[in-house]
């Protein structure tokens, strides 16, 4: 008996089936709002577009809160950082197979003309934003008929499942055993109004699938005989506590906090950054005297909106330390967002950063990108296996996959390609002939940036050599000299440099 049979046989008249369909996994209940914030942050939509992700002030009126939501602004750092990852990971990806049908499928994996690389970019973007995303490898239940059958062969197609759409799941020692996702109701005509509250359900286990409409009625059911659930879960950072979900690249609550700080700054600047014109009058001034002052101001200054007290005229301004504190907190949150992505928002001076700190920063980012590249490699091969499970029923999918000789190669180096550009920039600076002192400092910084992982004693020795060098000792090395010396140092430490053999 499959894991979804209970829902199929449940009575719909009593509402039991719909109640079971609406049931969600406890982990889903715990993380759902956080996942939605992450997805909204990546696309700049949802609560970041409507202002719903703003936190109301303790004593804020409904009108003031609505006004603040209307004026809210969102700076999309999440999209910028995630797209940086996508560009690095999906550049120069190579695919090979002896199966021409698979090659054709790679050019259109969703039935809408989307190539495999673009599809995976979209799935990975959602996974990085929210922590995980699913990809359903589905197939039309019946083969196409009619004159176009030869041109439109039946073949699998991919569907991205956002984490907020995967309502429930079961995992055992073999992996994913069953999954329940929510899906939109079929598209209606332009003259009808769509109801976003009306969604259906799609269920899969290792033997069958079933689809239910928004009322809970069974609309379709079938047996797929794959022996596996055709859903692959992409988790860039797997959760340590939950085997099904992952962790977002950037904590969504931090992005939401930054969004709120921007709104709070606007409130302070708009409603509190003002000057109050104060006119002081003598203590013995009468009401007539005060009215005379108002008329005089209206005629001479152009305003009668003033505060009148005893003394001399003055401007009183609000204390702007609050705005400065909010802005400083925004800078801190932005730096934290970049730090979570293993990047630096503001590069401190080279002298302020230790060689160990720079080395660890580069190493951390490089290792993160490498692990993601390995993940994408394995994920894409898993997608190819599900493709052959559909194309060769009867448990022959793995054999067909092996015969196809599928190979996928993702980039494995992410920092070394910048070496030549770094060398050229520093060599050009040295060649400016800025004088002995400036040239020595430039050379120190060049070594510091190009070789951040040197041992402290080695870095100290190099620094002393540069300090002790005289003007005629090759301080103004040309670009080729500097390039060759840096390459030799890297090779001495076992680091291979592209093109070094030719040099």
Residue locations for each model-derived region?
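Extended, helix-rich architectural segments
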Residues: 1-158, 480-484, 488-503
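Polar/charged side chains located within well-ordered beta-strands of beta-rich proteins
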Residues: 7, 17, 194, 199-201, ...
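Short amphipathic alpha-helical segments
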Residues: 112-120, 127, 329, 333, ...
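Short secondary-structure capping micro-motifs at structural edges
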Residues: 119-124, 321-325, 364-372
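Extended, regular secondary-structure scaffolds
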Residues: 127-240
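C-terminal helix-loop subdomains that flank or include functional centers
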Residues: 292-305, 332-503
């Amino acid at each position: 008996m499959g894991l979804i049979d209970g829902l199929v046989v449940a009575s719909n008249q009593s509402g039991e089936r719909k109640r079971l369909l609406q049931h969600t996994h406890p982990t889903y209940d715990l993380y759902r709002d956080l996942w939605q914030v992450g997805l909204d942050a990546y696309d700049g939509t949802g609560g970041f577009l409507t202002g719903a992700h703003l936190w109301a002030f303790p004593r804020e009126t409904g009108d003031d809160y609505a006004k603040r939501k209307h004026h809210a602004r969102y700076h999309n750092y999440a999209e910028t950082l995630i797209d940086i990852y996508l560009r690095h990971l999906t550049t120069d990806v190579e695919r090979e197979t002896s199966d021409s049908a698979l090659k054709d499928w790679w050019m259109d994996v969703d039935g809408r003309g989307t190539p495999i690389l673009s599809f995976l970019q979209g799935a990975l973007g959602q996974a990085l934003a929210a922590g995980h995303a699913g990809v359903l490898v589905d197939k039309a239940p019946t083969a196409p008929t009619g004159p176009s059958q030869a041109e439109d062969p039946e073949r699998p197609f991919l569907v991205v499942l956002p984490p907020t759409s995967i309502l429930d799941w079961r995992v055992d020692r073999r992996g994913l055993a069953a999954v329940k996702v929510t899906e939109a109701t079929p598209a209606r005509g332009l003259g009808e109004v769509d109801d976003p509250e009306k969604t259906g359900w799609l269920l899969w286990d290792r033997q069958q699938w079933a689809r239910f409409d928004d009322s809970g009625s069974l609309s379709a059911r079938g047996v797929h005989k794959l022996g596996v659930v055709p859903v692959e879960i992409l988790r860039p950072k797997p959760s340590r506590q939950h085997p099904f979900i992952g962790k977002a690249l950037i904590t969504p609550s931090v992005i939401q906090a930054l969004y709120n700080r921007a709104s709070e700054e606007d409130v302070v600047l708009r409603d509190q950054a003002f000057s109050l014109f104060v006119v002081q009058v003598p203590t013995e001034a009468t009401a007539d005297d005060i009215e005379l002052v108002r008329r005089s101001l209206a005629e001479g200054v152009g305003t009668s909106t003033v505060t009148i007290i005893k003394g001399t005229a003055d401007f009183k301004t609000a204390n702007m330390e609050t705005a400065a504190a909010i802005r400083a907190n925004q800078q801190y949150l932005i730096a934290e967002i970049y730090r979570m992505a293993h990047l630096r928002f503001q590069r401190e001076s080279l002298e302020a950063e230790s060689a160990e700190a720079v080395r660890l920063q580069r190493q951390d980012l490089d290792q993160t990108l490498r692990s993601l590249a390995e993940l994408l490699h394995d994920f894409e091969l898993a997608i190819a296996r599900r493709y052959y499970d559909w194309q060769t029923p009867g448990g022959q999918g793995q054999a067909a996959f092996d015969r196809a000789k599928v190979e996928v190669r993702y980039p494995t180096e992410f920092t070394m390609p910048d070496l030549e550009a770094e060398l050229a920039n520093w060599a050009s600076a040295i060649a400016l002939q800025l004088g002995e002192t400036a040239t020595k400092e430039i050379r120190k910084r060049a070594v510091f940036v190009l070789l951040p992982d040197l041992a402290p004693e080695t870095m100290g020795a190099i620094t002393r050599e540069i300090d002790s060098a005289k003007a005629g000792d090759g301080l103004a090395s040309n670009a080729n000299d500097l390039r060759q010396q840096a390459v030799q140092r890297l090779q001495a430490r076992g680091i291979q440099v592209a093109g070094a053999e030719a040099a």
